[in-house]
């Protein structure tokens, strides 16, 4: 490979490198997390791209084994990654993430490049959780931290201080207005009797509406320094909801999507679960909500006392105003990634469209595909998810799959149709070990530009049944040559010519997956320093 690369470096680049690819090319996977501990459990990456420099990427993730949240930064389009510093929290809230079926953290850039990062901290002594937000103007070298209001704990009111799975939006019209949504009453089945006041399950039973899990949002109008009281985004919804996901409409309205967890009245089958669309026109003060999809029953479990719909992944085309949402269907048949669109600001919705063009080899009744959705500036709709279609280890009668892949599909006609699915990971993910066995799993990370889609996922390739290690991996799905993806239209410190030539050389050498990880960027990456831990000054109200 080196010889071919060296030979090609002296040749002029041809006009072929100026083309726009019809079919995308997938680059080799890059390991993001670099700690060498024998037992590590990095999981549920969230991904964002800088608004002015598509080579600058950030990933938020958490180590499920050490209960640490982390942020990683790349300044060269994801070729290499460096850890940012972790924002300081009070001594009794040092942990991160707990009992999740969604993302443990979220992050987003404001238009001016300010980075906002929300995560769920956990208290080791009680397993209670709360949401923090951090703000950085230097890509994670330093942070300003604030604590969001809590829902409880107040067992008498059936709220237990278990706030998790944040979703973050920075208002495009006013970058000082920050919205953070989260899910309450998560994981309380693992809390001690001293916290719940009961030695029986208190979660989401319809019998007495006890311990309802709800989608909350809090708004800051001063860039995240202080926060308003939380608002329930599901007024009138009597069942437990699943975790909320936020996006912002073209006209500035805040939009939220979440599903439903229904449990029976202790006998018979539960009611069907719905996908909900909630919106606010007054910056998060009040919400109107309506169901936009009803999940059909699963005949494989005709006596099930639980129905679940979650993992709603929304996006908006800022040119047309189209609103999109993808989610995992867990009703009749094998699970699918479904997609709907609205062209009239959410008033009406298209029939659901199946995105995956291959099916898993078994039924299940709990989230496992975790789709994520992103919309490129040019309107291309990108969806990525975990997929079991190639599971060679599945045996008849298994209720748990073994080998998982990451797949991607795109739409260039506003979500009317999707292109053939593309596998983006370069080796199967063995799910016989790792945090997923403890239900620590969540969405694929995704972010889009016109020229590339960036995808991150958790991967066990460096682990085994003894260490059970899991890392975060990353790749690019390119719609343009490497020179354009890594160079762009302005000088960002990396030679576009070198990137393109090396990409061409290795592509020709291997005749398949394009490997670009050998390129050494001329831009130097910042080396974060670890500040002395401090207890930040935070606002810590409790809403009970």
Give each language-model segment a name.
Residues 17-526:
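Extracellular, repeat-based ectodomains that mediate carbohydrate processing or recognition
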Residues 522-544:
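Cytoplasmic C-terminal tails of single-pass
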């Amino acid at each position: 490979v080196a010889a071919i690369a060296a030979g090609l470096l002296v040749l002029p680049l041809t006009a072929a490198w100026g083309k726009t690819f019809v079919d995308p090319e997938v680059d080799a996977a890059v390991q993001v997390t670099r700690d060498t501990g024998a037992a590590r459990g990095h999981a549920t990456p969230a991904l964002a791209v800088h608004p002015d420099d598509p080579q600058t990427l950030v990933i938020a993730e958490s180590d499920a084994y050490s209960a640490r949240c982390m942020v990683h930064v790349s300044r060269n389009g994801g070729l290499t990654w460096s850890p940012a510093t972790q924002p300081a929290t009070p001594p009794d809230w040092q942990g991160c993430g707990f009992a999740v079926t969604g993302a443990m953290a979220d992050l987003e850039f404001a238009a001016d490049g300010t980075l906002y990062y929300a995560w769920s901290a956990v208290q080791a002594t009680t397993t209670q959780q709360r949401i923090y937000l951090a703000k950085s103007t230097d890509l994670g070298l330093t942070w300003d931290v604030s604590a969001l209001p809590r829902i409880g704990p107040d067992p008498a009111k059936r709220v237990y201080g278990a706030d998790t799975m944040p979703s973050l939006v920075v208002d495009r019209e006013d970058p000082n207005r920050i919205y953070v949504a989260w899910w309450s009453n998560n994981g309380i089945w693992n809390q001690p009797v001293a916290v719940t006041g009961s030695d029986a399950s208190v979660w989401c039973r319809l019998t007495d509406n006890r311990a309802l899990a709800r989608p909350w949002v809090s708004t800051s109008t001063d860039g995240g320094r202080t926060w308003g009281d939380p608002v329930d985004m599901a007024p009138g919804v009597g069942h437990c909801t699943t975790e909320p996901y936020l996006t912002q409409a073209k006209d500035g309205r805040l939009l939220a999507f979440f599903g439903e967890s229904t449990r029976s009245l202790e006998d018979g089958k539960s009611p069907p679960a719905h996908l909900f669309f909630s919106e606010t026109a007054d910056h998060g003060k009040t919400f109107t909500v309506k169901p936009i999809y009803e999940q059909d029953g699963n005949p494989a479990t005709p006596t099930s006392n639980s129905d679940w719909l979650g993992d709603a992944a929304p996006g908006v085309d800022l040119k047309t105003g189209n609103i999109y949402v993808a989610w995992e269907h867990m009703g009749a048949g094998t699970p699918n990634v479904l997609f709907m669109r609205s062209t009239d600001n959410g008033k009406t919705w298209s029939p659901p469209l199946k995105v995956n063009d291959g099916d898993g080899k078994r039924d299940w009744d709990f989230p496992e595909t975790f789709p994520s959705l992103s919309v490129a500036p040019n309107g291309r709709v990108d969806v990525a998810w975990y997929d079991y279609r190639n599971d060679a280890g599945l045996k008849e009668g298994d209720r748990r799959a073994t080998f998982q892949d990451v797949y991607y599909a795109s739409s260039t006609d506003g979500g009317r149709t999707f292109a053939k699915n593309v596998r983006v990971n370069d080796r199967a993910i063995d799910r016989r070990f790792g945090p997923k066995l403890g239900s620590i799993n969540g969405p694929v990370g995704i972010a889009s530009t016109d020229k590339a889609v960036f995808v991150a996922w958790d991967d066990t390739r460096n682990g085994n049944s003894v260490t059970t290690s899991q890392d975060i991996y990353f790749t690019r799905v390119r719609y343009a040559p490497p020179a354009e993806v890594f160079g762009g239209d302005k000088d960002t410190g990396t030679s576009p010519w070198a990137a393109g030539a090396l990409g061409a050389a290795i592509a020709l050498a291997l005749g398949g997956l394009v490997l670009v990880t050998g390129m050494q960027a001329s831009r130097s990456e910042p080396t974060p320093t670890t500040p002395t831990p401090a207890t930040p000054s935070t606002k810590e109200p409790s809403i009970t």
